[in-house]
Amino acid sequence: MEVSNSCSSFSSSSVDSTKPSPSESSVNLSLSLTFPSTSPQREARQDWPPIKSRLRDTLKGRRLLRRGDDTSLFVKVYMEGVPIGRKLDLCVFSGYESLLENLSHMFDTSIICGNRDRKHHVLTYEDKDGDWMMVGDIPWDMFLETVRRLKITRPERY
């Protein structure tokens, strides 16, 4: 069995080297491949954990509504003996009295600040330095600047 290699030869004399052929002039294509890293739109939409777009848009709308008043100071409130804490916005209260009234209703107990009466729970707070102090020792405005979390302690501790 014979295998023949036949190639047609192309002579350079048949092509004029000074004039580019129409096929040569149209070959000047630039190939540019770009792989987009992450578009700004996509970066803004990356959530973890992933949530549905309708829920994301709803939450986004609520954030925009809250930005108008920008007055919220959420702190966590714990009560000794109660396994679940609560989150509370301190900016809705006018002072210590309204805070104590709300906490007494929320935890269904009587709470005091400042005085040490053995019949009532005592409200303490952690300041920005990590120290625990009695609520009511400083003015309300200063309290709002320093409070990090609240704890309702048992009466027997004091």
From Swiss-Prot:
Main location: nucleus
Compositional bias ranges of the Low complexity kind: 1-40
Induction per the UniProt record: By auxin.
Keywords: Auxin signaling pathway, Nucleus, Repressor, Transcription, Transcription regulation
Entry-linked PROSITE patterns: PB1 (PS51745)
Motif (EAR-like (transcriptional repression)): 29-33
An annotated GO cellular component: nucleus
Region (Disordered) residue spans: 1-49
Domain PB1: 72-157
Cell compartments where the protein resides: Nucleus
Domain of life from the UniProt record: Eukaryota
Gene3D superfamilies hit by this protein: Phosphatidylinositol 3-kinase Catalytic Subunit, Chain A, domain 1
One MF annotation (Gene Ontology) recorded for this entry: transcription cis-regulatory region binding
GO biological process: auxin-activated signaling pathway; gravitropism; response to auxin; root development; shoot system development
Role description: Aux/IAA proteins are short-lived transcriptional factors that function as repressors of early auxin response genes at low auxin concentrations. Repression is thought to result from the interaction with auxin response factors (ARFs), proteins that bind to the auxin-responsive promoter element (AuxRE). Formation of heterodimers with ARF proteins may alter their ability to modulate early auxin response genes expression.
Domain notes per entry: The N-terminal half of the protein contains two conserved domains I and II. Domain I includes a slightly degenerated ERF-associated amphiphilic repression (EAR) motif which seems to be involved in the activity of transcriptional repression. Domain II is required for the correct degradation of the protein through the SCF-mediated ubiquitin-proteasome pathway. Interactions between Aux/IAA proteins and auxin response factors (ARFs) occur through their C-terminal dimerization domains III and IV.
Entry's family note: Belongs to the Aux/IAA family.
UniProt xrefs under PANTHER family: AUXIN-RESPONSIVE PROTEIN IAA17, AUXIN-RESPONSIVE PROTEIN IAA31
Subunit structure of this chain's protein: Homodimers and heterodimers.
Name of protein: Auxin-responsive protein IAA31
Lineage, top ranks: Eukaryota, Viridiplantae, Streptophyta, Embryophyta, Tracheophyta
